[in-house]
Amino acid sequence: MPIRIRLDELLKEREMTLTELSHRVEITVVNLSILKNGHAKAIRFSTLVRLCAALECQPGDLLTYVPET
């Protein structure tokens, strides 16, 4: 998929676990794992807003476009 989720990198930079993020954004660890591993087909804006608030970042910090070659 040409959209890459940088959740792992942001969690490491903030020394935060997936479980801690799950509690902060009220999304299950399973669903966050699906997103983190690039298996999600879509993300709701409300989810993106909660992730950005919890990680203190902008959407562009979390999502990157990688052209397919």
Model regions: which residues?
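A short, Lys/Arg-rich alpha-helix, primarily the initiator
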Residues: 1-16
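Residues within the helices of the helix-turn-helix
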Residues: 8, 19, 49
